[in-house]
């Protein structure tokens, strides 16, 4: 997973997979989901992040991911 905070375009993007984006859908105002050819989510974009989040919270963003052992269980 890759996370990109673009202050110039005021967007936060979570790239979950490197699969090709085939379709994008704004599922809620300012929330766009990217899908691959099979309909799986490959990315999530949050627009207008400066309005929705405190910048200090985004700068110190921490991601908790399960270990492979926990996912396989």
Tell me what each language-model feature is.
Residues 12, 38, 70-73:
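Intrinsic disorder/low-complexity segments
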Residues 17-49:
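Amphipathic, hydrophobic secondary-structure cores in small proteins
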Residues 1, 10-12, 29-31, 40-42, ...:
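A generic structural signal for short beta-strands and their flanking turns/coil linkers
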Residues 11, 16, 35, 51, ...:
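Generic low-complexity, intrinsically disordered sequence content enriched
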Residues 2-3, 7-26:
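Structured beta-strand/loop patches that form or line metal/cofactor-binding pockets in enzymes
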